[in-house]
């Protein structure tokens, strides 16, 4: 619903005519827990009429109060919210200057805040602590991915939570697709052989010629959440690959929409040249990828993990890789992270370790802040929301 729709719903405040400047004092009506509240959405608002199209009007009145919170302080916020986004946030809200840590919050420094912006390093408090320290709080906009570590006390206390998890999923999807395309060409094993000596060049050529490439090659996905589904779409639409997927929450209709074939993990590991893990990080999935599955990998198969390390029984993966050196593991995550000194992963030729780089890095992080600013604008103006996280969703999200 646009701003004009909200204006026209105001009881005895506006007629069907275009609202005047004097009438447009408060333009957001939010029914929250049965309480009607009126807010402005910043210095300007656009009101749409059939005759006049769009006209811009100055809006005066009290605005919602917002604050940035992060245990990493200013540096943590600047990683995700660039100057342009923060300036636009200041035009939507009255801001409490500074960045506040959990200690600051418990000390009562954001008691007037109704909206919070954060990212990795979001302060973790109990439901009671939030209620005491931020009694006016209505919404949290989290410019990062998983909210599992902090969201439950807020949601159970009636605070709405929004996350940029889909924005953070874009670079993970891109990274994963790139790794799959390389793996299907035999890149990792061929690169290992070529790097040893000139004499190993012929062995590298024999190795990569045993691969099918990226035409009708079976690829397996464990998990079809936002990232898994994004990977599936790209593999099906941009490449002619046969995608097998396992996800107990995915229906046949959803699988058909994505163009994937549902299969159990045993079939996926036995059939697919490349298998990529995108399972949600919940207690039920811990240790689900074990020797019974890894031992089924094809002799030149690749296992990719950009999800979470906890789903992998690492000693079982090591065993399967040692039994068949032509197999490869590309691990952007481990459990713990990083792996402890002396772990078998270190020094194994067929293990590629990266320091959790699949997610947003550098300028990619600013996309998450920009998406949360846009979601906050939508929330204020009554437009359809895109990235809200509910208690029900939290049970199955990564």
Protein language model annotation of sequence segments:
Residues 1-31, 46, 53:
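Short, low-complexity intrinsically disordered segments enriched in small and basic residues
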Residues 37-39, 43, 47-115, 397-398:
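N-terminal glycine-/charge-rich "phosphate-binding" loop or analogous flexible N-terminal tail
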Residues 114-196, 211-212:
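Phosphate/diphosphate ligand-binding glycine-rich loop within oxidoreductases
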Residues 124, 250-344:
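Rossmann-like adenosine-cofactor binding region
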Residues 161-162, 299-398:
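Rossmann-like dinucleotide-binding domain for NAD(H)/NADP(H)
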Residues 173-192, 237-241, 370-378, 383:
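Oxidoreductase and adenylate-handling cofactor-binding alpha/beta cores
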Residues 191-230:
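Glycine-rich NAD(P)-binding loop of Rossmann-like domains
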Residues 238-256:
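NAD(P)-binding Rossmann-fold cofactor-contacting core
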